[in-house]
């Protein structure tokens, strides 16, 4: 009798689909991650995804009705990335026309100095790392952290209708990493 029970359990185990095993479960999502010396806390509504190119140290994505939004994180040694202003100018040059004045804010948090930029207007298409086609009403949210020996750059770009609802999350992510009081 015991043999038949063991045989029955063994056959049942063999009949389990492969999806019943842990290897098929999605990878756990990190709650926090590091880019250089900075710690970022992933917002609950965003997913961690592998960086899509070698310049990115980390990448988060969120599905929206207008497509997928990405928050990208990059690290650049101070000598190779230019000044904070050069990076802000580079982002501004990605727009052929601004519908609102650029909004820049420099703050020194308890962790490091942080400069944020918000741009809204027509985002050029066909640029490396940018959209394939021009986006007429686009918004760029950016932050540059000045850490010891490097800049950590965080950026989210997309249609303004998609960026508007996540703007608070983005700035909260930046404030926490930079040690900036709300």
Regions found by a protein language model. Give the residues of each.
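Solvent-exposed, acidic/flexible segments
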Residues: 66, 80-84, 134-137, 156-159, ...
């Amino acid at each position: 009798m015991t043999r038949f029970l063991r045989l029955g359990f063994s056959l049942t185990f063999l009949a389990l689909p492969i999806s019943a095993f842990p290897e098929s479960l999605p990878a756990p999502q990190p709650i926090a991650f590091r880019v250089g010396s900075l710690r970022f806390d992933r917002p609950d509504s965003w997913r961690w995804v592998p960086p899509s190119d070698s310049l990115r140290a980390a990448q988060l994505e969120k599905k929206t009705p207008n497509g997928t939004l990405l928050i990208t994180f990059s690290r650049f040694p101070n000598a190779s990335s230019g000044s904070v202003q050069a990076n802000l100018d580079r982002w501004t040059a990605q727009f052929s026309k601004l519908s609102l004045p650029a909004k820049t804010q420099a703050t020194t948090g308890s962790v490091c100095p942080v400069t944020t930029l918000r741009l809204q207007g027509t985002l050029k298409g066909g640029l490396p790392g940018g959209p394939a086609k021009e986006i007429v009403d686009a918004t760029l949210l950016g932050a540059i952290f000045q850490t010891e020996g490097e800049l950590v750059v965080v950026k989210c770009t997309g249609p303004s209708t998609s960026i508007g609802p996540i703007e608070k999350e983005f700035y909260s992510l930046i404030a926490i990493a930079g040690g900036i009081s709300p």
